[in-house]
Amino acid sequence: MRFNIYFSLHTYMYIHIYIYICMYTYVYKYMNTVMTTLAKCVGIMTACIQEPVPACQQNRLALRQIPRRHPPSRDHHLLLRLRPRPLLLRPPRTRIPRLRR
């Protein structure tokens, strides 16, 4: 009877230790990933703060330079000329010059 109690207590203890070790490793790994992501976020934020022109402001400036569709401006024809041409599927046929005899 005593042996059984001792054995059960030992198994209980070992199971608990195993569970604690598993939990610790899992939590440690999870916290490691969380900390790395936090560090990355903080690094990006500090880089944004230290920049002379923040990225958001740069984006705003870039958006301001994009011409609006409505209302059409006076130099609409120039904007149309700036529009990229669609790529041709086949190259244009070039005439092969014949050798003169």
UniProtKB/Swiss-Prot annotation:
Domain of life: Eukaryota
Additional comment: Partially overlaps NAP1.
Name of the molecule in the record: Putative uncharacterized protein YKR047W
